[in-house]
Amino acid sequence: FRWPDCEAERLYVMNKVLNEPDFPPLAIMHELMIGARLLRHSKGKALPTKAGKAMIGDYGALQAELFDAFFLALDRGAYERFPIEYEDADIVHFLGVVQNRLDDWVPMPELAGWCLPLDLITSYRFSPVSDASYYLLSRLTRPLLWLGMIEQHPDDDRRTRIEDRSYRKT
């Protein structure tokens, strides 16, 4: 996996040793692999199960298993900085938008407008577009980035406002 903004040079600037919580994609992937029964803990070590060993070298099968675990089994709300619930949020619809509309670079506000009914968001922290963007960041774009299914525009970095980021399918 290649995770944007999680390159070794950047991570080791502040720490000489990294733990999973210092590296969110790894921490979540570890949890997903435990939940999907691809890893187990024994004597303080994470070891692959039979199913996990069977997936070694089969990137497509591993990606599909982690995708299912993330979008069907994991409580993504636990990883949100500002938990937001939208009654009309539908992950199947979100994934359809990604499949059909992210062939070229799409700015986050446009993606948010396609995924969520922005005009129906009446209670918000910053603005309807900002709240929808944060919601999609934790529930859709970040997981798909970590799974390698979409990419963030190369000119965007950690300091780029979420509303100014652009994404496309890989």
Predicted region positions:
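Leucine-rich, amphipathic alpha-helical/linker segments
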Residues: 58-115
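Short, amphipathic alpha-helical interface elements at domain boundaries
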Residues: 1-28, 54
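Conserved aromatic-histidine-acidic binding/catalytic patches
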Residues: 14-25, 44, 58, 83-86, ...
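DNA-recognition alpha helix
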Residues: 1-7, 107-123
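Short amphipathic alpha-helical interaction segments
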Residues: 20-35, 42, 127-148
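A compositional/structural signature marking long, glycine- and acidic/polar-rich segments
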Residues: 118-140, 148-164
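Intrinsically disordered or highly flexible coil/loop and linker segments, enriched in small
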Residues: 39, 104-111, 149-153
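Accessory beta->alpha helical hairpin/"wing" motif in late/C-terminal subdomains of nucleic-acid enzymes
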Residues: 27-29, 36, 40-79, 151-170
